[in-house]
Amino acid sequence: EFRRVLFRSTLDDGALRVVDYKTGAPHLEFDGVESLFTGTGKQRLSNILQTLLYAMMLHRSRGCDVEPALYYVRNMNRPGYSPQLDDKQTGVKGARYTLYRERFEELLRAQLAELYDTSVPFRQCEDADTCKYCDFNVICKR
């Protein structure tokens, strides 16, 4: 079971908007839920994945529809900035979590099953640059 205290959540048009603030370069576009689990290194859009995890937890705990959003601090005050996720596969910007729920949770369960499967050997990522700011580089010795 996941638990997380959210930075902020606000009510928006009848749904709850889960907001996560980020300081890095903005990444709001993705190519469908599958891309969140198959990308490697810099192509893996962990901020979007993390925000969908928050949306999943909020949806499950409150039983309401949730819109995941990312506020990138360096861009959020610019005219026309939108914190909404932009799914290029479906062509939907600002989708509610329920659009992704079934497939997202299926892929998440598969990812967690692989992570805890002792028959699957640990592999370091191929791009060592990815490890520069990783919290776990001490564990994998990179």
Describe each model-derived feature in a short phrase:
Residues 1-142:
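RecB-family 4Fe-4S metal-dependent nuclease core
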